[in-house]
Amino acid sequence: MANKMVGKGKLPVESEDAQKLRFQAELEFVQCLANPNYLHFLAQRGFFKDSNFINYLKYLLHWKDPEMAKYLKYPMCLYFLDLLQYEHFRREIVNAQCCKFIDDQAILLWQHYTRRRTRLTSLGTTSLTGLAVGGQPVGGGVQGPLLSNEPLPMANNNNNTNSTNANNPQAPGQQQQQNGAPMIQQNGLSNNTGMSGGVMGSGARDGGGVNLSGQKVS
């Protein structure tokens, strides 16, 4: 279908088929710019010295818009499209050594980017799985050094002792003496002597209790 003229001196209105064809041609050409060897090919044949071709490269900048860029399979082409806007780059890309250097750097970038992206994705998945709310992991995740640098809470003997006393209430006389054995207290730690007179947990002796300082208690 032929293009229709809107009026005298006006640009023709493209038909739907013509717009589709132009879209496909631009999409293919823009993505070819991701290949440094293709840029070297164009430079050797003098395309980058043609003012019309340079204007066309400026026109192609509309592919950087999100609505157009979403169709690109090789987004690296937009980086080279920006470089082609500079005369210095258009002049240097004709050099084979420059082209080889850019090609090698692009390959290294893709290799390291893939590895780095895989590693970051793996760490991100672990962080989301072990995301803590109120100090507790959600979804069965395990918190590790990568997820939290906060020190682990230390055990509080005073709280444990108070909790034990609260769960097992006793009369004041019973707390101080149980089964005829005195209560020994040092540094806030209570140690109850057993029937044999030894300190509960360590230092048991027959016939008398031993406090935490090693002195014998009758």
UniProtKB/Swiss-Prot annotation:
GO terms for molecular function: transcription coregulator activity. Component of the Mediator complex, a coactivator involved in the regulated transcription of nearly all RNA polymerase II-dependent genes. Mediator functions as a bridge to convey information from gene-specific regulatory proteins to the basal RNA polymerase II transcription machinery. Mediator is recruited to promoters by direct interactions with regulatory proteins and serves as a scaffold for the assembly of a functional preinitiation complex with RNA polymerase II and the general transcription factors. Its main location: nucleus. It is found in: Nucleus. Belongs to the Mediator complex subunit 31 family. One of its GO terms (cellular component) is mediator complex. Pfam families: Med31 (PF05669). It comes from Aedes aegypti (Yellowfever mosquito). Component of the Mediator complex. Residues 195-211 have a biased composition (Gly residues). Keywords: Activator, Nucleus, Transcription, Transcription regulation. This is Mediator of RNA polymerase II transcription subunit 31. Transmembrane segments: none annotated. The keyword Secreted does not apply. Residues 142-218 are annotated as: Disordered. InterPro entries: Med31_sf, Mediator_Med31. GO terms for biological process: regulation of DNA-templated transcription. PANTHER family: MEDIATOR OF RNA POLYMERASE II TRANSCRIPTION SUBUNIT 31 (PTHR13186). Residues 155-187 have a biased composition (Low complexity).
